[in-house]
Structure formats: C-alpha cells, structure tokens
A protein has these predicted regions:
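A short glycine-/small-residue-rich loop at the edge of a beta-strand within enzyme catalytic domains
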Residues: 144-145, 173
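Active-site flanking residues adjacent to catalytic metal/cofactor-binding acidic residues
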Residues: 141
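PRPP-dependent phosphoribosyltransferase catalytic core
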Residues: 2-86, 90-99, 155-284
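Structural motif
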Residues: 86, 136-138
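Short, glycine/charge-rich flexible loops or terminal/linker lids adjacent to PRPP-binding catalytic cores
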Residues: 95-135, 145-152
Length: 284
C-alpha cells in the first residue's frame, strides 16, 4: 500500500515527509506510519507523535560500532585487563536476549582480541562458576531502562558467588544505551560505575515544561486510549508512557523493542480488538 492509497490528509503527508528526512529508517514503514496517523483523533496527537519520532534514537550499525569502540576505551580508562576481568551478559542461563546479542558484537571489538575473546561469558549462572576472589566483573546489558533490572542482577551474582565463598571482587556496569534516570538510579542503588555510550532523557517529561508538559502528557494518554486494554496477557495500564513511565524513544535496528518505549509504538492491538501495524516490534 502506498501513502497515497492510504488517503491521508495533506498535513499528515507533510508530517511523513519530515520524518522520512529526519529518520530514514521510517521510509520502509510508511504503511505503519499511515496507520498510526489514522489512529489519532486530533491534529495535536499527530503533531506530538511527529516530534517524538523525530527525537527517536535508532541504534543503527554506525551507532553500535561507535558504542563498541567507546566500551573498549572505557575498559582502558577503568584500567582493567583480561587476566582478571570478565565481561558478563546479564542473561539467565540458556536465555537469548539483548545482552547476549550485544555481547557477541562486543567480542571482537575489545583490544587486544586474542587476550580478551575468552573473557566474555553469555549469562550470569555460567559466570558464577568462573569468577574468583580478586577478579573484576563488567555486567553488560544492551539497554538500561529504569536501572532496576541491572541492580537485581548485581544482587543475584553476589548471592551465587557467596555460595562458592567468593566475596572479594569488583563489579562494573555497562550498556550501549541507557536512560539517564535509570543510570542515576543504578549508581545510587549499587554504588558501581556505569558506562553508557548513549544516554537518553525521558521523551516528554524532560523535553517540555509547564503547561506544554501537562498538555503533552495529556495528549499522549489520549493516544494510548486508542489501544486495547490488554495485549498478550499484559495490561496497558502497566505500560502507560512506557514501563514505569520511562518515556523511552529508543530501539536497536531490527531488534526487540524495550517495554520502556511508549506503547503507541509497539502495542499492536486497538481498543476495538483489531490488530494494529506498529512501527516497532516487541516479543515477550
């Protein structure tokens, strides 16, 4: 279906041309954009979505490569070396998630490769069998949202290691991208250094102020009112403005969308129970 076939208004067509220019990845999603604009019941809703999508951070190949390079630099700044340092994905045993995928991309970017390649571990249970007293551990996730998940993973790793009598080690945290408020929470909660190549502000609350903020939040909730109350056994009320109201505008290219993202971009059921073609995809 072409944009013209969608019979959208001239104003909506102008919005999309702006988005195609600002966010080239949206060009292949013109049908999804047309559906999203058609879902809106006011011009104010369309204008808010236009501005938010223009601010969206899509982690493409170039940004990802830069994040890997900056991670490598951060390791040097932390003065860590491969003889006693482990880089551990925060995944559970036998789980494939964003942390394991990101770790694989990091594996050949940390120098010197021949010394570091064996120091990457794909999940926390496996790492708990290898970490010893005096070691350094970099817990890695591709994205830090609220920071609470990483804080829980730190406690879990400590518990597993104590079962082996290992208690003298240092933990560092790292991600490709993180929400500023989540990174701050993690630092405050764990007192650990945290690296993020890209740090993001909340999409609405940390962009608008005063009456504009109040209006923007109200408009977004109006838009969310067009979505189904439940989806895959989840309740929309638990994800309004994104999980724990994170207001996230981020996804890695061709990857699973974090639940911290505004649900209007991934919640694929309308309130009339009909399917909705979303800009982003989320499994789980």
């Amino acid at each position: 279906m072409s944009i013209a076939a969608a019979q959208i208004s001239p104003e909506a067509l102008y919005d999309m041309l702006q988005l195609f220019d600002a966010q080239p990845w949206t060009k292949r999603l013109h049908e999804e954009l047309a559906e999203l604009w058609a879902l809106c019941i006011s011009r104010n809703q369309q204008l808010l979505l236009r501005e938010l999508i223009k601010d969206f951070c899509m982690l493409d190949a170039d940004k990802e490569l830069n994040a890997c390079k900056e991670f490598n630099t951060q390791i040097q700044d932390w003065k860590l070396n491969p003889t006693n340092t482990w880089v551990v994905a925060v995944a559970n045993a036998d789980e494939i998630d964003g942390s394991t995928a990101g770790l694989q991309k990091l594996k050949n970017k940390v120098h010197p490769h021949e010394e570091w390649h064996s120091r990457f571990i794909s999940n926390i249970p496996s790492s708990a069998e290898k970490i010893n007293n005096g070691d350094n551990v970099i817990l890695f996730d591709d994205f830090i949202g609220t920071g609470k998940k990483m804080a829980r993973k730190i406690l879990w790793l400590k518990k597993l290691l104590l079962q082996r009598g290992v208690g003298d080690f240092k933990i560092f945290c790292a991600c490709f991208t993180g929400m500023q408020f989540g990174i701050k929470h993690l630092i405050d909660e764990s007192n650990r250094p945290v690296f993020a190549s890209i740090s993001l502000k909340r999409g609405i609350s940390e962009r608008y102020v005063g009456d504009e903020l109040t209006n923007a939040l109200s408009v977004m909730k109006e838009i969310e009112g067009q979505l189904g109350e439940t989806y895959r056994n989840k309740k929309l009320v638990d994800y309004t403005l994104g999980f724990e109201q994170s207001e996230t505008l981020y996804c890695a290219a061709n990857d699973n969308c974090p639940n911290n993202v505004f649900p209007i971009l991934w919640w694929s059921i309308r309130k009339n129970k009909r399917p909705f073609k979303t800009l982003l995809q989320r499994a789980g």
